A protein has these predicted regions:
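N-terminal small-domain helix-loop-helix segment of the aminotransferase-like
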Residues: 26-121, 126
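Conserved PLP-binding catalytic core of the aspartate aminotransferase-like
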Residues: 306-307, 315-349
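PLP-dependent aminotransferase-like
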Residues: 130-187
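Short acidic capping loops at alpha-helix termini that bridge into adjacent secondary structure
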Residues: 59-60, 110-114, 134-137, 181, ...
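PLP-dependent aminotransferase class I/II
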Residues: 74, 95, 241-325
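PLP-dependent enzyme catalytic core of the Aspartate aminotransferase-like
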Residues: 19-22, 201, 345-353, 357-386
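Active-site pre-lysine segment of PLP-dependent enzymes
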Residues: 153, 171-181, 193-216, 220-251
Length: 386
């Protein structure tokens, strides 16, 4: 009997190991086929990573890679976040009612026309979950924010890339690319990474000209930097199929809290809410965002500082005989000849910038920093490009 138990135990263990090994070996076969070739988004390098890699003091590193607000969040937003810490044992308000109400008052819309996201990236993903099926088409600019393409591929849709002459979205070409399979069109204005923007008039005309089976998605991540931003609210009130997306990560300085929002018709937002995960925006982010939205003086101050920083960088780049793309946002796309090499050389000096994909491989993107950070970046550029 004891020998039988030994044999049974040995057989069971062998069988278990064999099946575990088979399960592990076949893991990719169990995955959604689309995930296997899915590119992974690469964010800007973190200060801690660069400090460790190059043995630098983190305090001496300038992170000019991710278009963050170098002056930080509004003091009132920071205070509101600290106060919210006392209640982190509780789940956040699931619908974000107070924040949606604050946003709706700011925009002159109803709160049920607002959807909150864990960053505006989540809103982009929700659009895919709700509207895209395999074989659908999504129209994007050649040099637009890469997440539109990544999301489309993950959903089984086909991203249709439209050339951007002079690094500006060609709305006529985008319109000509529409087919009966087109579901979504993404237009970021200002655009990341080029910093270019289409005029409000042409954006509104484009949105009004779209056929009924197409949803127009205007990414307004950098809209607070524009003197004359487009306004989709009249089209939204008409019930048109448009959605605008904004973030608290840029001028509001809340990138670390991951919070953004979209606004559109009640019907469109109601559909997106069906795909939204419960408690997707944490309580600290909600509290800080409400305070940030109210502090319009801080936003105006940061906008003015950014304008000054753009002028400082533009003058410095001209003195270095470097070409750049005039920007409507809080960064500059700079032609340095060899983008990857320059990125690495600057990084070794404690200046973190952003290298570009193959289609823009002669450029690096440099976020506007404080006056001192801009000065350090220009000095480092002069050193590495001599």
């Amino acid at each position: 009997c004891f020998k039988q138990l030994q044999v049974y135990h040995s057989f069971s263990l062998s069988l278990c190991l064999r099946f575990n090994r088979i399960d592990y070996m076949n893991l990719p076969q169990l995955a959604n086929p689309r995930i296997l070739d899915q590119p992974v988004y690469q964010p800007g390098k973190a200060i801690e990573d660069v400090a460790r890699e190059y043995k630098l003091n983190p305090k001496d590193i300038c992170k000019l890679a991710s278009n963050e607000n170098p002056w930080g969040a509004s003091p009132s937003a920071i205070d509101a976040g600290k106060e919210a810490l006392h209640h982190i044992h509780l789940y956040p308000e699931g619908s974000g009612a107070e924040l949606r109400c604050a946003i709706s008052e700011n925009l002159g819309l109803q709160s049920d026309q607002i959807i909150l996201g864990n960053g505006s990236n989540e809103i982009i993903e929700l659009l895919g979950h709700v509207f895209l099926e395999e074989g659908d088409e999504v129209i994007v600019g050649e040099h637009a924010f890469v997440v539109y393409k990544l999301m489309s591929l993950l959903m089984g849709a086909k991203p249709v890339s439209i050339p951007m002459p002079n690094l500006v979205h060609d709305l006529n070409a985008m319109h000509r690319a529409i087919t009966d399979k087109t579901k979504l069109i993404f237009l970021p204005s200002p655009n990341n990474p080029t910093g270019t923007a289409n005029s409000p008039e042409e954006i509104l005309a484009f949105a009004q000209s779209l056929p009924g089976h197409v949803i127009f998605c205007l990414d307004e991540a950098y809209t607070e930097y524009l003197e004359d931003p487009p306004d989709l609210r009249p089209l939204i009130q008409e019930g048109r199929k448009v959605l605008a997306m904004r973030t608290f990560s840029k001028i509001h300085g809340l990138a670390g809290l991951r919070i953004g929002y979209g606004y559109g018709s009640e019907q469109l937002v109601k559909l997106l809410q069906k795909a939204r995960q419960p408690f997707n925006v944490n309580s600290i982010a909600q509290a800080s965002a409400i305070a940030a939205l109210k502090d319009k003086d801080w936003v105006a101050q940061c906008r003015k500082r950014n304008t000054d920083g753009l002028e400082q960088m533009a003058l410095g780049l001209k003195n270095l005989n470097l070409e750049y793309v005039p920007s409507k946002a809080n960064f500059l796309l700079v032609n340095v000849g060899d983008g990857q090499s320059t990125f690495e050389s600057l990084q070794a000096k404690g200046i973190i910038t952003r290298p570009m994909p193959e289609s823009l491989n002669s450029f690096v993107r440099i976020s506007i920093g404080t006056e001192e950070e801009n000065r350090k970046a220009l000095t480092a550029l002069k050193q590495v490009l001599v």
